[in-house]
C-alpha cells in the first residue's frame, strides 16, 4: 500500500521529521510532503514547501493536499496528515502505531473516511452541528482516503475569509447567524475562559491578541466543520474504540509528558553549568 504523508511543522525542523519517519516507518512505502509554517525560518531544502500559515495546520494541509492532487494523483492509497504537535505534545510512536492499524480499513472504504482520535463534546455544545455526532476527529493527526481528500478540499474552498465570523471571534454578534448558537459559545469559551479545563492551552498568552484568537477560532471551527461534514457524507474511524485502548492512550500520553518534562529539567541543568 502506498501512503503519502503531509506534515505541517512549526517548531521542529523538517530534518527531524524526515529522520523520525525514516526510523519508525522503515518497513512502510511512503512519500513525505513537509509544509513549513515557521515564517521566521530560512528554508533551503527544495523538498520542503514554504507554508503561508494563514490558518495554521489547515492552510498547510490544504497546500500539501493540493500538491498531492496535482502531481501524484494516482500514486497513493492512503493519506496521513499531521502537525508537529504530535511530537511535541503527544506520544507520537504510540499514536501512529494505532492509527496505522486502520489504514487498510480507511483505504478500503468507498465513501469519504477519516481516522484518528475521536474526542467527545464535553462542555456547552454536546453534539456536532453538522453531523449530530457526540464526538469529532482531532485534527493534529489523521488518515484519510481519496474520497475524503476530495471532500476535505471542497470544504476548505467553500469557506470564505469572512465566514463564520468577522472582526473579533470573541464577540457573539460577529458570528454568522447560520452557525448553531451553542457551537459559537463553545468556540468562544475555548478561547477566552482561561480558568476552565477546556480552554486552549495558549489562551492566557494570547488573550489580548485578537488576530491570534481569530486564526485559532477559525481553526477550531474548521476542525469541527470538517469532521462533521465528512461524517455526514461518509464515516469517522476511531483508532481507540474500546475503553482499554482509551486507557492505554491516556497512560502513554502521560508517560510522554513526563519524559518531556524530565528532558527539559536535564537540559536546563546542563545549560546552567
Model region roles, listed by residue range:
Residues 1-273:
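ER/Golgi luminal nucleotide-sugar-dependent glycosyltransferases, focusing on the catalytic module
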Amino acid at each position: 500500500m502506498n501512503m503519502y504523508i503531509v506534515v505541517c511543522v512549526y517548531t521542529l525542523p523538517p530534518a527531524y521529521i524526515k529522520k523520525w519517519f525514516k526510523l519508525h516507518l522503515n518497513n512502510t512505502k511512503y512519500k513525505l510532503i513537509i509544509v513549513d509554517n515557521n515564517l521566521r525560518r530560512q528554508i533551503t531544502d527544495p523538498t520542503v514547501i514554504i507554508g503561508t500559515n494563514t490558518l495554521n495546520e489547515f492552510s498547510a494541509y490544504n497546500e500539501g493536499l493540493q500538491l498531492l492532487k496535482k502531481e501524484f494523483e494516482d500514486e497513493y492509497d492512503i493519506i496521513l496528515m499531521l502537525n508537529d504537535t504530535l511530537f511535541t505534545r503527544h506520544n507520537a510512536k504510540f499514536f501512529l502505531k494505532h492509527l496505522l492499524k486502520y489504514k487498510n480499513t480507511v483505504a478500503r472504504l468507498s465513501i469519504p473516511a477519516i481516522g484518528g482520535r475521536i474526542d467527545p463534546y464535553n462542555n456547552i455544545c454536546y453534539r456536532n452541528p453538522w453531523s449530530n455526532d457526540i464526538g469529532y476527529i482531532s485534527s493534529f493527526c489523521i488518515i484519510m482516503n481519496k474520497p475524503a481528500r476530495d471532500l476535505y478540499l471542497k470544504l476548505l474552498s467553500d469557506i470564505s475569509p469572512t465566514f463564520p465570523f468577522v472582526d473579533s471571534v470573541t464577540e457573539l454578534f460577529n458570528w454568522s447567524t447560520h452557525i448553531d448558537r451553542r457551537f459559537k459559545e463553545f468556540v468562544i469559551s475555548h478561547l477566552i475562559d482561561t480558568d476552565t479545563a477546556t480552554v486552549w492551552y495558549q489562551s492566557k498568552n494570547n488573550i489580548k491578541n485578537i488576530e491570534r484568537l481569530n486564526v485559532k477560532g477559525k481553526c477550531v471551527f474548521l476542525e469541527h466543520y470538517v469532521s462533521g461534514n465528512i461524517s455526514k457524507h461518509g464515516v469517522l474511524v476511531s483508532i481507540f474504540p474500546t475503553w482499554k485502548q482509551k486507557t492505554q492512550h491516556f497512560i502513554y500520553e502521560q508517560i510522554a509528558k513526563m519524559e518531556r518534562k524530565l528532558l527539559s529539567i536535564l537540559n536546563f541543568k546542563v545549560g546552567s553549568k
